From Swiss-Prot:
It comes from Shewanella baltica (strain OS185). Keywords: 4Fe-4S, Amino-acid biosynthesis, Cysteine biosynthesis, Heme, Iron, Iron-sulfur, Metal-binding, NADP, Oxidoreductase. PANTHER family: SULFITE REDUCTASE [NADPH] SUBUNIT BETA, SULFITE REDUCTASE [NADPH] SUBUNIT BETA-RELATED. The gene is cysI. GO terms for molecular function: 4 iron, 4 sulfur cluster binding; heme binding; metal ion binding; NADP binding; sulfite reductase (ferredoxin) activity; sulfite reductase (NADPH) activity. This is Sulfite reductase [NADPH] hemoprotein beta-component. Belongs to the nitrite and sulfite reductase 4Fe-4S domain family. [4Fe-4S] cluster binds at C429, C435, C474, C478. GO terms for biological process: cysteine biosynthetic process; hydrogen sulfide biosynthetic process; sulfate assimilation.
């Protein structure tokens, strides 16, 4: 591989002085609202992406103006947990320093801001720092935000699992001082020539992004098998004893390039809790050393495992960890949805899960969601938990405070909306107008599309059946569409590829059923299939399993062979 020309990003990382590049100079330049091409890649490691308003792109071009550049900043919030005080700080930033005046909950249990002018970036990062929050490694070729099941019902087990997720996040952070120097005005420390700046990552970091999740069965809201590295909690007598480790998942692919494909992770075996960091570091360093640095489209861990083989990869991980995998423990992976409304935990505290459509927290007529969460944060004594379904849990509410919290939620439209099973299980990415990769709408169109799905389910008498529906504007897969029972992936404006056949639990991928079709064709196809499902389904059979059983699509068993075949 050393004889081949590496991907451009590899040279950028090598020459960046551990992610410094010329970001500081670009930040100080008032000539343009953008960064240089090279720095646009490096700023991802600091937690943000350069974007522009694509709705205005042509108009500004005609006016001989540069695109209306802005930035999307994503925070690092392991397990999605923050305090009410932190949330008030997060809210203030959205209201005063972004043009979108909104907060977007993501599919990886964190939040992001859209519409940040370059001049406000440093202020936002410093304001986040004052709330003990940051955006380090929220993007880039590093370990991203670590997900953890936010289940507040089994409070002790969740606490133990969350502690592991937090430790993973902290342990695998980049060590470079670039973030502190550029954004927090800390002094650059003198270093010796032989000093190891990045003991885990090295000078070129990872070949591509790396995603981790901790699942607490029976819930699989974190979609553990879609991650590069997953830890499925194993408990005995309510105590965490270890994890089943999974590796090699990932959603991204490229339209028309069959050498790229989504993939679910493989099961590797059971590991004890005390060995988690050894195995996490082992898997990451194997990917660091074996991953493809020539073709970024083939550089995720899933391709490393496919190319080198399961057994060879497993043996190398065991060698580096210094521990052997034990046989996988039996656990049951179930629902990927959230528990909406009030649920009582084993500790007697109450938890209120609020549905946030597409994760967008913004004040709208009749639904002042942002104000509502702000008012709750002012009086709440527990914590806020963001879910991977883009929702919010007001966790740890004392019984005597329930009425007050619920009253505020209802007053501001956070509670009381009619929520079907399918809408509650469905998510979409941001897409247009800010995402530069989007080929079609997602977030802006998705609520209307789900209205159509709800109507079709009602028509056929199957409204009680939750169906996992996901939509993305491109095949990078941020909303994990290839693990949805109905997946819609943007191909062109108003056109989508329709995927069917994933399992409800997230243990089998879907497969393309129709390519490049418009809304009318999508709905006609689903109308027919829902009609068949209503009369032909077996007892308890989910929609995804039905479409495979009756031959609408073939089951994807081995993604490298089956997804496109």
């Amino acid at each position: 591989m050393s004889e081949q020309k590496l991907a451009l990003n590899e040279y950028l990382k090598t020459d960046s002085d551990y992610l410094r590049g010329t970001i500081k100079e670009g930040l100080d330049s008032a000539v343009t609202g953008s960064f240089s091409d090279g720095d646009q890649q490096l700023i991802k490691f600091h937690g943000f992406y350069q974007q522009d308003d694509r709705d205005l792109r042509n108009e500004r071009k005609e006016q001989k103006l540069e695109p209306l550049y802005s930035f999307m900043l994503r925070a690092r919030v392991p397990g999605g947990i923050c305090s009410p005080q932190q949330w008030l700080g997060v809210d203030k930033i959205a209201s005063t320093l972004t043009s979108s005046n909104s907060i977007r909950l993501t599919t990886r249990q964190t939040f992001q801001y859209h519409g940040i002018p370059k001049r406000n970036l440093k202020t936002i990062i410093q304001d986040l720092d004052r709330e003990a929050l940051d955006s380090i490694a929220a993007c880039g070729d590093v370990n991203r935000n670590v997900m953890c099941n936010p289940n507040p019902v089994e409070s002790k087990l969740h606490e133990q699992a969350y502690a592991v997720a937090k430790q993973l996040s902290d342990h695998l952070l980049p060590h470079t001082r670039a973030y502190a120097e550029i954004w927090l005005d800390e002094e650059k420390l003198l270093s010796t020539e032989d000093e190891t700046v990045e003991p885990v990552y090295g000078k070129t970091y990872l070949p591509r992004k790396f995603k981790m999740a901790v699942a607490v069965p029976p819930d699989n809201d974190v979609d553990v098998y879609t991650n590069d590295l997953g830890f499925i909690a194993v408990a005995e007598n309510g105590e965490l004893v270890g994890f089943n480790l999974t590796a090699g998942g990932g959603m991204g692919s490229t339209h028309g390039e069959v050498e790229t494909f989504p993939r679910l992770a493989d099961d590797f075996g059971f590991i004890k809790t005390e060995d988690v960091m050894k195995f996490a570091e082992a898997v990451m360093t194997v990917q660091r050393d074996w991953g493809n640095r020539v073709n970024r489209k083939r550089s995720r861990l899933k391709y490393t495992i496919v190319d080198h083989g399961y057994e060879q990869f497993k043996a190398e991980v065991e060698l580096r960890a210094g521990v052997k995998f034990e046989p996988k423990r039996d656990v049951v992976i179930g629902d990927r949805g959230d528990r909406y409304g009030w649920v009582e935990g084993v500790d007697g505290k109450w938890h209120l899960t609020l549905f946030i459509e597409s994760g967008r927290i913004k004040d709208l007529p009749g639904q002042t969601l942002q104000t509502g969460l702000r008012e709750i944060a002012k009086i709440h004594k527990g914590d806020f938990r963001m879910t991977s379904n883009q929702n919010m849990i007001i966790a740890g509410v004392a019984a005597e405070d329930k009425a007050t919290i619920e009253g505020l939620a209802r007053k501001h439209g956070l509670l009381g909306q009619v929520l079907t099973q399918t809408r509650g299980h469905s998510i979409a990415c941001v897409a247009l107008p800010t995402c530069p990769l989007a080929m079609a709408e997602a977030e802006r169109y998705f609520p209307e599309f789900i209205d159509h799905i709800d109507a079709l389910q009602a028509k056929h008498g199957i409204s009680e059946q939750a169906i996992v529906v996901r939509m993305t504007g491109c095949p990078n897969g941020c909303a994990r569409p290839f693990a949805a029972e109905i997946g819609l992936v943007g191909k062109a404006p108003g056109r989508y590829n329709l995927y069917l056949g994933a399992s409800f639990e997230g243990t089998r991928l879907n497969k393309m059923h129709r390519e490049n079709i418009q809304e009318a064709e999508i709905l006609a196809e689903l109308d027919t299939l829902f009609g068949r499902y209503a009369v032909e389904r077996d007892a308890g059979e989910t929609f995804g399993n039905f479409t495979v059983r009756v031959g609408v699509v073939k089951a994807v068993i081995d993604a490298a062979k089956d997804f496109h075949g």
